[in-house]
Every structure is written in structure tokens, then in C-alpha cells.
Amino acid sequence: MKTNLRYLFFILICILLTSCTRYIKPEKFDLDPQLLKSLKSNVPIQVLVPKNAETKYLIEYSGWRPMLGKIYIDLNDLYHNAKELIEEVLVKNKVPLSTNSPKYLKFTISKVQWEHWGGGFSIGAYLEFDIETGDGYKRHYRVQDQSSQNVDRAVGGTTSRAVEQIFQDEKIITYIESN
């Protein structure tokens, strides 16, 4: 009996020490059209995101109590979603896209975090990113989103919030509309 208890105790310790590791795939969500400013341009622009980004990026837990589990994401998935959403806004506003245009918007992620909200009934996620234009303008943003379901949805939603933030920036709108 004591031997069985020792084995059980040993197994429990191993489980607690290794904790849980999850790899998530962020979803892509629609943008809120009321938050997007209209723009107009006939000058081609390209959207740049890092290629071959980190495939096993640890999403930092920013809550007050330590978490045993770790959540990882492939940053290429977030970049893919962000690029698609930015290009969708440009195309919807009839701004031509070109992969070799000197005019560009460059989107770079600097940090992804998550935490429990509302006593654990909701999950919040934060995305810090930089947006840079071809004329040298650069701005750092931190956006957030939440989900009552899971981290995947909360992190995926931050990409939509980031793109909405980009297209509210007057300097970016002016740059896109300039010749």
C-alpha cells in the first residue's frame, strides 16, 4: 500500500512539474466598420509583415498569480491574419496593392499577453505592435480583446483590434492618401 502511494505521489509531482502546454491557432475576426475611417488613393501600397517569424512564441501571462501552464502561438499565423485584414481594408477602399511599391505599411508584433478577467469568467489578451510607414512615421500601440470562451479567441481578436487602431490613425490615413 505504501509503495502504491509513493508511486501515485511521484506521478502527481511529475504532472505538476511538467504542467500543461498548449499551442493555439488564432482565429481571424471581422473588423468593426464603424471604427474605420474612409480613405481614398490611386497610388499602390504594399503591406509588409515579417516572414519566418517565431513559430513557438510563448504568450506571456500577465495576471497577478502565477500560471503553471504555458501557451504558445505561431507568430506567422498572427502576421498572416493582420496582413489579410489590412489588405482587405485597403481593397475595400479601392487602394491598389503592389508587392513592389515603394509605399508601404509595415506591421510588427512586439508582445502578446493574456490574463484572466472577471474572476476567471473571461480571458483578456493584449497585443503590442508597431506600425511603420514608408515616409518614416512609426507608432507603437497596445490593444486588447476578450473572450468568455478561450485564449485562442481572445488573442485572435487582438489582431482585429490592431487593424482597427491602424485605420484610425490620421497620420497613416494621410500617408495612404498622399501621392
What function would you assign to each model-found segment?
Residues C20-Y79, E84, T174-N179:
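A structural "domain/chain start" motif
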Residues M1, Y57-E60, S101:
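Short hydrophobic/aromatic-rich motifs at helix boundaries and adjacent loops
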Residues L85-P96, Q165, D169, I173:
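Structured segments of extracytoplasmic/periplasmic soluble domains
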Residues M1-C20:
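Sec-dependent bacterial lipoprotein signal peptides
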Residues L12, K37-L39, T99:
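A generic structural signal for short, solvent-exposed coil/turn residues
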Residues T21-L31, E88, K92-N150:
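Surface-exposed short loop/turn segments
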Residues E54, L127-F129, Q165-D169:
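Short alpha-helical linear motifs
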Residues G63-N76, G134-E177:
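Short secondary-structure boundary motifs at beta->alpha junctions and helix caps
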